[in-house]
């Protein structure tokens, strides 16, 4: 219930625990879409924000899109305030003296800026570049959710100045894995058609582990061209479990069961391959 959250110290402890177990945590600030929390924070704390140098004149709704509370603005004066606000947030969390984000890669999000308007595309592309530059100044690599088709391809804009950003490919309606690789982008396969689980929701509740074991490989992308097994730009694959909204009672144990099975089969197929003589039933006995 409520709004689960970590303090900065708790989040650092969680990352350090993962790193002690051999994992590299990738932290994400998913904006300018999915930004209701930031807009609400500014509205509720505007007087405190105005005490910060450089933010004395921020309007009450200074970073919000004028059409949706879920979106940060990417145009006009409010778009400039949004850039300034997010840059300040990244600078705080990537502070070299005491960083909150410990991994070597930071994800800037930028997916699902719903119903983007013609006068917002330039601002979106500028937002991507500005946030990437801000993260890179701290020595981190930058990643984003694959959205180049929407923001670049469909508008006839070249991506050549953005190939320093790694791409999490998640949807063929938002990006094209083969095209991005050919352009020089490093890509990660997290194709929603195969690898998404939406716990207790109206879409796929559980990743079809048996299907993944029998039919999937790291170069399997749904309707997005062909990526070759030896492609040096394919960094690997990952699975996703979106457990933030549930239409029915879901416990932490339910999520744990799903995540373990998803992660295990993805590891088997990505790192270990599959013994041609091993059946899914034999594999599943490991659990």
Predicted regions span which residues?
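Feature activates predominantly on carbohydrate-active enzymes
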Residues: 1-107, 130, 134, 243-245
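Soluble non-cytosolic domains of exported or imported proteins
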Residues: 5, 9, 76-80, 84, ...
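Active-site-proximal loop/turn and secondary-structure-junction residues that shape catalytic pockets
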Residues: 29-35, 112-114, 148-150, 171-173, ...
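Acidic carboxylate-rich catalytic motifs and surrounding loops in phosphoryl-/glycosyl-chemistry enzymes
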Residues: 30, 144-151, 278-281
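Short acidic, glycine/serine/threonine-rich loops at helix termini
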Residues: 36-43, 118, 155, 199-201
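Active-site neighborhood of glycoside hydrolase catalytic domains
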Residues: 60-166, 170-185
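Flexible, acidic glycine-rich loops studded with aromatic residues
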Residues: 155-165, 172-287
